[in-house]
Amino acid sequence: MTKGAIFGAVAILTGALAAAPIPKGKEPPPATDKQRDLARDHLKQLMLAFHNYESALGHFPHDLADKKGKPILSWRVAILPYFDRAGAGDELYKKFALDEPWDSETNKPLIAEMPKFYKPVRVEAEAGRTFLRGFAGNGALFEPGKKRRVIDIAGADGTSNTIGIIEAGESVVWTKPESDIAFDPKKPLPPLGKDIDGVFHAARLDGSILRIKRDFDEETLKAAITIAGGEVPEWGKISPPEKNR
């Protein structure tokens, strides 16, 4: 499959929504076209980096670990050299001590240099923190100890039916490992999304962007999180009508 085919379908983004109700008088103004385009571009570039990494190393990214297997840096650091735009992450990647923890004397100052692709477009967050997270748990992309390949996912639920990254309800330090959302298909999902325009977003592994409504069906979203559950998600149960996308 060509990169153009993988990323041909990219939905219009508007931002993210908090799971808790927004207090009256605190609603943000409607997103501008520029903000929508920027949010779309961030997630598109992130998924391109995922596939570039997979093409180079044979599996999707995961947290970087030390010689004993202990995670020391997030996958967000690992994919820096694989962003399509020249120099988008190469120079920053070279600054990291890849054999040291995220909060070491060398690596901790680099938290402040978080790339724009991880920054919220409209939602406030502390410097160096991102809402873009994956799911870690049984059957999810970032299941600990698993190296997921695109061929495995394509032969199971399919990349178009599987979520890679989602806008989470809580931000995390972008370089910190083991910072993805704990996932157990038998337990309720945590709050997802942040305060924008009544929806939040997820990037599917085919590169398309899914808009998710506030009152999404939880079981349908869980089906989209697993890579080999055998389900074809009913997108209408979690995504707003086409006219509102």
Q: How would you label these PLM feature ranges?
A:
Residues 1-5:
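Positively charged n-region of N-terminal signal peptides that target proteins for export
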Residues 7-18:
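Hydrophobic membrane-insertion alpha-helices, especially the h-region
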Residues 18-25:
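Boundary at the C-terminal end of the N-terminal hydrophobic targeting segment
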Residues 26-245:
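Internal low-complexity, small-residue/proline-rich segments
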